[in-house]
Amino acid sequence: MPTELDKIFLILAIVEFIIGLLGNVFIGLVNCSEGIKNQKVFSADFILTCLAISTIGQLLVILFDSFLVGLASHLYTTYRLGKLVILLWHMTNHLTTWLATCLSIFYFFKIAHFPHSLFLWLRWRMNGMIVMLRTLSLFLLIFDSLVLKLFIDISLNIIDKSNLTLYFDESKTLYDKLSILKTLLSLTSFIPFSLSLTSLLFLFLSLVRHTRNLKLSSLGSRDSSTEAHRRAMKMVMSFLFLFIVHFFSLQVANWIFFMSWNNKYIKFVMLALNAFPSCHSFILILGNSKLRQTAVRLLSHLRNYTKTSNPLPL
């Protein structure tokens, strides 16, 4: 029977799933309809759509994993179902993280303004750089999947033993291999994190500098461009905050699983880890004028529909 902690965990996991699903389905539908209507797909819309599709897949895996952890955690080792779930989660998380990284870099070169020659040279070759990053992410996905498969096989073999401490004492070499594999997984996940962190921080600095210049101009602080830049800064910092929480939660989750796979605190780490795929879509909607305007129109239609379908009694 699930405990009270398990029930709370499942409720929060379902809420995260619904929030993330609504936001990403909305992004996918709007961009697909716009692409069909205009017979043209822009680079930002393409990356956004791919990110939404990848996140939807990740959310489905997360929901299944949450039910598995909350209701039948023993299946992770009894039927080796956990191996498949972990691999699927890792693949979808890898794609989502790298697509978010590509989007961060794309916005950085599109919005930021730096007079440095290296920045101008990279901006000129931005499309080729995005393609190169996607190719690199696919190679790293294959490498990570092989490393993770070996890591899971060794971990599950250790868990199958009746005495974990005794098994570690007798198999120090195997424990060292696990440490090496865990380090490799952490290093490969650090690559997209460092790229996103760098691009978002430089984008934020560029927006701050541009906003300061607008304040000093004759337009005044109430200029619409200034307000737009302030809103963009808030969106960038919110996205960056979620990305940082996601990265460090991933490292903590890997460490907890490495030390004790059935630790009760893993549930809380999973909730923090899943906040990024659940909430980042709404940050993207608020930061994108087309998506934001479409969302406002949709909410207005829904509000009018509820008023007409439920008229006030006389």
Swiss-Prot record:
PROSITE patterns: G_PROTEIN_RECEP_F1_2. The keyword Iron-sulfur does not apply. One of its GO terms (cellular component) is plasma membrane. Gene3D superfamilies: Rhodopsin 7-helix transmembrane proteins (1.20.1070.10). Residues 29-50, 123-127, 209-238, 287-314 are cytoplasmic. The keyword Endoplasmic reticulum does not apply. Glycans are attached at residue 163. It is found in: Membrane. Its main location: membrane. InterPro entries: GPCR_Rhodpsn_7TM, TAS2R. One of its GO terms (molecular function) is G protein-coupled receptor activity. Keywords: G-protein coupled receptor, Glycoprotein, Membrane, Receptor, Sensory transduction, Taste, Transducer, Transmembrane, Transmembrane helix. It is a multi-pass membrane protein. Residues 1-7, 72-101, 149-187, 260-265 are extracellular. The chain crosses the membrane at residues 8-28, 51-71, 102-122, 128-148, 188-208, 239-259, 266-286. Belongs to the G-protein coupled receptor T2R family. Most taste cells may be activated by a limited number of bitter compounds; individual taste cells can discriminate among bitter stimuli. Receptor that may play a role in the perception of bitterness and is gustducin-linked. May play a role in sensing the chemical composition of the gastrointestinal content. The activity of this receptor may stimulate alpha gustducin, mediate PLC-beta-2 activation and lead to the gating of TRPM5. This is Taste receptor type 2 member 42. It comes from Pongo pygmaeus.
